[in-house]
C-alpha cells in the first residue's frame, strides 16, 4: 500500500488534476480541458495495464517538460476505444508550423473530395482561318486560365502546344495571356516573414525550377510570365508562330474555343504537400477551398472554409486562428486538442481517412519522417505531419499501440532553441505510445 501511495504522489506531481477516463460517444461530447487523464487506478494492485504504463511514462515526460524552458502541449486519444488517454496543456494556443497543413488537407478532403480536379484550361479567342500563305491562323489571342495547379511542368506545356496544333492553328496573330482571376493579387501569404523562404502565390506557374529558359531572364517575382515564355517556346517548337505574350488579364466572356484542359486531383497534390511538407502545394490547396464557386478568393475566404470544417468536429473555433494553408504565418494558432479533434473527425469519415492515411509521412520510412524514429516500435508505425519553423516544432498524426488500438496524437513545442531537441522529445513520446 505504501508503494502504491508513493507511485500516486509521483504521478500527480506537477499535474493539474486527476480524473477518471470515460468513453466519449462523439466528437462533440469531448470536454477540452487541460487535465491529465488516466484510467481508474486500483490502489492494492500492481500497475500492469497498457494505459497505466503509458500514463506513468508520459507523466514523467510532461514533468520533464514542466522543467524545460519551452512550452509543450500534448493530446492523445484512443480512436479504437473512443476515449481520451492523456492530455497536457492541450488547450494552450500555440503556433503549429507545418502541422497547419493537416487542417488544410482534412478540409480539402471534406469539402472538395479526393477526386476534385485542379483545371488549367486553354482557350482560343477569335476566328480561325487561313492567311494569305494558306496557314490556319488564330485571328485573336490564346488564354491560359490558371487554377493554381502546383504540378504543372514543361511536359504539360508540350501537351498544350500539341493541342493547339491539333486544333489546326499554325499561327497566332494575337498574344498569349494568363487569366489569374481565381485568387487575389497578393503574392505572399498573410503574416509571412519577409526573410522566410516563401513560395510566390500565383494561379499559373511551373513546378519548381522547371522553366527551360536559359537564353532568357527568369522573372523571379513573376512566375506567370515565366510560364507564358516557356509556353511560347513550345509553340514555336511545333512551328506555331506567336505575336508575343501579354500581361495578366481576364479571358473575354464572349465566344471562345476550348483547346485543352490539364487536370490534377486533390489526392495527387496532397501526396507531395504532406510527405514533403511543400508550402506551395499547401497554399494551392488552401485557395482551392476559397475559390470553390467564386473568383478572386482571398486568404479570408479560404480560412472561413477551414473554420467551417473545424466547427463540424464540435471544437470551439475560439481556440484557433487560421491565417494560411501551410503554417508559415505568424498569425496561425492552434491547440493540441484541435489537432486531435480533426484527426478523430477524419477517422470517422472513410472518404477523408483513407486518402489522408496514404499521404502522411511514415516514421523511419519516407517523407519528413524518413530519418526520425528509425528503430523501435515507432518505426514504420507512426504516421504523422511534422512542423518546423524557428522556435516551433510539432508532430501530429496516428500511431498503433501495442494493445492493437489506433491512437491520434498531437505534440506541439513552442519556444525551443533548436528543432532537434524538440524532435527528440516528440520521438520519445511516440515511442511510449507505440511500445
Feature-to-residue mapping (PLM):
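Bacterial Sec-dependent N-terminal signal peptides
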Residues: 1-35
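Extracytoplasmic
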Residues: 69-71, 89-91, 99-100, 115-117, ...
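Active-site SXXK
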Residues: 82, 96-114, 176, 230-235, ...
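A conserved catalytic-loop motif detector
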Residues: 143, 159, 181-214, 218-229, ...
Amino acid at each position: 500500500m505504501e508503494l502504491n501511495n508513493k507511485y500516486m504522489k509521483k504521478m500527480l506531481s506537477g499535474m493539474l488534476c486527476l480524473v477518471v477516463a470515460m468513453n466519449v460517444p462523439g466528437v462533440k461530447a469531448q470536454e477540452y480541458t487541460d487535465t491529465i487523464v488516466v484510467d481508474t487506478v486500483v490502489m492494492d494492485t500492481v500497475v500492469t495495464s497498457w494505459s497505466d504504463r503509458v500514463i506513468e511514462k508520459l507523466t514523467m515526460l510532461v514533468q520533464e517538460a514542466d522543467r524545460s524552458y519551452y512550452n509543450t502541449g500534448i493530446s492523445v486519444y484512443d480512436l479504437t476505444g473512443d476515449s481520451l488517454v492523456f492530455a497536457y496543456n492541450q488547450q494552450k494556443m500555440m503556433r503549429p508550423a507545418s502541422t497547419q497543413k493537416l487542417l488544410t488537407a482534412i478540409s480539402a478532403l471534406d469539402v472538395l473530395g479526393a477526386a476534385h480536379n485542379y483545371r488549367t484550361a486553354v482557350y482560343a479567342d477569335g476566328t480561325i482561318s487561313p492567311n494569305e500563305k494558306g496557314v490556319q491562323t488564330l485571328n485573336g489571342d490564346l488564354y491560359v486560365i490558371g487554377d493554381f495547379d502546383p504540378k504543372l511542368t514543361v511536359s504539360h506545356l508540350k501537351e498544350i502546344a500539341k493541342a493547339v496544333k491539333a486544333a489546326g492553328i499554325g499561327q497566332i496573330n494575337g498574344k498569349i495571356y494568363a487569366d489569374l482571376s481565381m485568387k487575389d493579387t497578393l503574392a505572399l501569404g498573410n503574416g509571412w516573414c519577409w526573410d522566410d523562404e516563401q513560395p510566390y502565390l500565383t494561379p499559373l506557374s511551373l513546378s519548381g525550377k522547371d522553366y527551360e529558359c536559359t537564353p532568357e531572364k527568369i522573372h523571379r517575382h513573376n512566375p506567370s510570365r515565366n510560364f507564358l515564355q516557356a509556353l511560347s517556346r513550345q509553340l514555336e517548337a511545333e512551328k506555331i508562330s506567336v505575336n508575343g505574350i501579354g500581361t495578366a488579364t481576364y479571358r473575354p466572356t464572349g465566344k471562345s474555343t476550348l483547346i485543352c484542359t490539364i487536370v490534377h486531383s486533390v489526392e495527387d497534390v496532397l501526396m507531395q504537400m504532406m510527405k514533403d511538407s511543400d508550402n506551395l502545394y499547401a497554399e494551392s490547396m488552401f485557395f482551392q477551398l476559397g475559390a470553390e464557386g467564386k473568383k478572386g478568393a482571398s486568404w479570408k475566404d479560404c480560412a472561413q472554409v477551414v473554420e467551417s470544417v473545424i466547427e463540424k468536429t464540435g471544437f470551439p473555433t475560439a481556440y484557433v486562428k487560421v491565417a494560411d494553408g501551410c503554417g508559415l504565418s505568424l498569425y496561425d494558432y492552434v491547440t493540441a486538442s484541435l489537432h486531435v479533434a480533426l484527426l478523430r473527425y477524419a477517422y470517422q469519415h472513410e472518404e477523408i481517412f483513407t486518402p489522408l492515411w496514404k499521404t502522411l509521412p511514415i516514421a523511419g520510412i519516407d517523407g519528413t519522417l524518413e530519418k526520425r524514429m528509425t528503430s523501435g516500435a515507432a518505426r514504420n508505425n507512426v504516421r504523422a505531419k511534422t512542423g518546423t519553423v524557428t522556435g516551433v516544432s510539432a508532430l501530429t498524426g496516428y500511431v498503433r499501440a501495442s494493445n492493437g488500438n489506433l491512437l491520434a496524437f498531437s505534440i506541439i513545442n513552442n519556444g525551443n532553441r533548436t528543432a532537434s531537441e524538440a524532435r527528440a522529445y516528440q520521438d520519445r513520446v511516440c515511442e511510449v505510445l507505440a511500445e
